[in-house]
UniProtKB/Swiss-Prot annotation:
Key words, A-Z: Membrane, Transmembrane, Transmembrane helix
Main location: membrane
Listed name of the protein: Putative uncharacterized protein YBR124W
Gene Ontology cellular component list: membrane
TM region(s), chain numbering: 80-104
Additional detail: Partially overlaps YBR123C.
Topology of the protein relative to the lipid bilayer: Single-pass membrane protein
Phylogenetic lineage: Eukaryota, Fungi, Dikarya, Ascomycota, Saccharomycotina
Location relative to the cell: Membrane
Domain of life: Eukaryota
Source organism of this protein record: Saccharomyces cerevisiae (strain ATCC 204508 / S288c)
Amino acid sequence: MPPHIFIAFCILECFVETLSGNSKLGILGRSNVNSSAINGGAWSALESGIDESVARGSSTGIFTIWKIFSLLKAIEINYVFPLVYLFCVVFQFLSLGCYLSIFFRKTKSEEAKKRTSLY
């Protein structure tokens, strides 16, 4: 995966986790990624193609996608990359859309509760 695409996914993941409050929810599920996994694992993965967080087993979310790429790169199935990449991009945006729809639905229901409590 090109480095700028990976960095864009990381920024998107951090943005969605910030929206969800205290990083409790990542795009693909609960995320326990700490700063050392992001700073150490991600950059070394860009250099070597092997994600250090895979060995620790300490993360989900964007690093799950990177695990898939690392495994495929390790077994050298290069023709699968475009398909996996396309799937990951589509899945990330679908997940973001689902999260945003839930977020806005919660906001609307809270506003409705406030209006009914005033009467």
